[in-house]
């Protein structure tokens, strides 16, 4: 709502993903409001995987789990890792996504991952040495 101020912080991480890298279907932490991914390179020809996959949860009467079973989801879109591609989405309880397993690539998948994250949620803590708010961000949490 526009009547309540919420403080957010931009958190980002440069990462690489080797052969064998994948992420199961999941949704991000509730503290992340807007999530983005920027692909920095293309993967070699002849390999497979590395796509960001977006899903819809099929069970209408159930609460959506943070890591639903694949058989309970339908693939909406698959986005290949191409240089300069920016993917962004509002994070919510139904923002389900995965990364398909990378196989037979001779190079790494380079990308920036980030989010606008609400302060005061699980990604934050108060540093006892100086009393200032610090953040802890890790793409693989």
Task: Identify the meaning behind each predicted range.
Residues 1-130, 134-135:
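Catalytic core of non-heme Fe(II) oxygenases with the double-stranded beta-helix
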